[in-house]
Design a protein with these regions (language model features):
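Alpha/beta enzyme core
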Residues: 3-37, 41, 47-180
Length: 180
């Protein structure tokens, strides 16, 4: 038996349905499960943000959405517009996918600008940048993390789940940021 008090995990969990074939019933089920289990948030595609916001109007569950998902290949103006629409529809958190091709080309100014555009459009909402670590070596991952910090993103996420290797990587690439 542990002397450490148990901390409930439910307030730390985002319940997600990003399936392209998700229906209104699927989103309602997701929201109902989040309420039932007292989860932190639901994460849905942008077209479902308003529906989730209506369903969760009186619940203590946040709503997250994805921007530029899953490829990150849309231009920064499109990502900004997606973010503005999500804000208008009631989103609380933004998970954006960084433009991988521009990053690989070394166009760091573009990456910082696109992240800043989303951060600005998100107003006071939390912005997480998905860097898709399966495509990159440790040095590139550290650079992507630094660009996200420079652009004032709140968090970095490792993977959309659609890229190679998912989010499985050695934790060494996060050491420069003081993370365990």
């Amino acid at each position: 038996m542990s002397d450490t008090p148990e901390t409930p995990l439910s307030p730390y969990i985002d319940h997600t349905n990003l399936r392209p074939d998700a229906t209104a019933a699927d989103i309602e089920k997701l929201c109902a499960e989040a309420i039932e289990h007292e989860l932190f948030a639901v994460c849905v595609n942008g077209s479902w943000v308003q529906h989730a916001a209506t369903y969760l109007e009186d619940a203590d569950v946040s709503i997250a959405t994805v921007i530029g998902f899953p490829l990150g290949a849309s231009d920064s103006d499109s990502k900004r517009y997606e973010t503005e629409a999500a804000v208008d529809n009631g989103v609380h958190e933004i998970d954006m996918v960084m433009n991988l091709g521009r990053f690989i080309d070394g166009d760091h100014k573009y990456i910082v600008r696109e992240i800043r555009d989303v951060v600005e459009a998100a107003e006071d909402r939390r912005v997480k940048v998905i860097i898709e670590t399966g495509y990159f070596n440790d040095e590139q991952i550290a650079t992507a993390c630094q660009l996200a910090v420079t652009a004032e993103a709140h968090f970095v996420k490792t993977s959309t789940g659609f890229g190679p290797g998912g989010g499985i990587r050695r934790p060494a690439h996060f050491k420069p940021f003081g993370l365990p």
